[in-house]
């Protein structure tokens, strides 16, 4: 009798890819990731609820680019701390069995033929802390006192700040005048939350102007609203007054790459403001510590 059988693992060994095949595989993977970012960009500008949720993700993960925020939002919107497998292992943290990695893009430098340095992007696989046996990091301590936050935002403003009794729009507590490169803040506004919201939004206008070759208040109005929303979300200030549900038709009708470009400009301006505010908060904290030591 002949024992005709097939070994259980026959054919299961993965074929070693040639250099060309590996490059083709990596190219296809990168194209799929970019397609995911494009599809997500179109999806969020077509749905106010998704757009709001995306801003929440970007606000929480402000160090990540807009493209990576889109990718994270699509794969695990509640993510809070991301590392690759090796970095989690270095911290003696294990990935949960069956956890699906999150694909993001990582910049890498390469030498061009002319000798200059170029930037390319590779797909990087990461995992969130919620996919591990590690403890979630405590929520960052933020200054939730609107009055104190207003002071810090104004002290770290990239443009001149002046108090005034009147503004072009009576219902506003602050207004950025681009021609004068000045942020005007209305005196004697009793609602400190409203002032904090307005200052955050108008700082958005100021930063967008600084970061752009040309500036139009009308064209950049929605971006400034998004910046104000993300800053207030990050600092624990009420965000209900921000009209982020009014997504401009012009934005919704753009091509994915143009949507990503606008989201990148918005994120970069927010990150610039947040960086200065964080530095100012740290400086004030150090000053308080010195006072306690005296």
Where are these predicted regions, by residue range?
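N-terminal accessory/interface modules of nucleic-acid-binding and processing proteins
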Residues: 2-294
């Amino acid at each position: 009798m002949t024992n005709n059988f097939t070994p259980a693992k026959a054919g299961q060994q993965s074929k070693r890819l040639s250099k060309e095949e590996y490059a083709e595989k990596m190219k296809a993977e990168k194209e799929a990731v970019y397609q995911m970012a494009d599809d997500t960009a179109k999806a969020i500008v077509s749905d106010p609820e998704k757009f709001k949720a995306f801003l929440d993700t970007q606000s929480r993960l402000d160090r990540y680019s807009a493209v990576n925020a889109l990718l994270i939002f699509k794969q695990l919107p509640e993510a809070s701390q991301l590392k690759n497998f090796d970095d989690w292992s270095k911290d003696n943290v294990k990935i949960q069995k069956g956890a699906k990695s999150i694909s993001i893009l990582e910049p890498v430098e390469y030498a061009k033929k002319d000798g200059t340095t170029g930037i390319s992007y590779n797909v990087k696989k990461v995992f969130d802390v919620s996919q591990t046996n590690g403890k979630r990091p405590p929520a960052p301590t933020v200054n939730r006192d609107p009055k104190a936050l207003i002071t810090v935002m104004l002290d770290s403003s990239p443009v001149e700040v002046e108090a005034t009794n009147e503004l072009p729009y009576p219902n506003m507590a602050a207004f950025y005048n681009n021609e004068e490169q000045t942020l005007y803040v209305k005196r004697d506004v009793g609602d400190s939350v409203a002032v904090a919201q307005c200052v955050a939004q108008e700082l958005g206008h100021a930063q967008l102007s600084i970061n752009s070759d040309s500036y139009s208040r009308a064209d950049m109005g929605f971006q400034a609203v998004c910046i104000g929303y993300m800053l207030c979300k990050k600092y624990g200030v009420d965000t209900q007054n921000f009209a982020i549900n009014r997504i401009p038709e012009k934005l919704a009708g753009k091509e994915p790459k143009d949507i990503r470009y606008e989201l990148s400009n918005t994120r970069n301006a927010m990150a610039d403001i947040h960086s200065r505010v964080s530095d100012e908060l740290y400086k004030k904290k150090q000053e308080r510590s010195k006072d306690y030591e005296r």
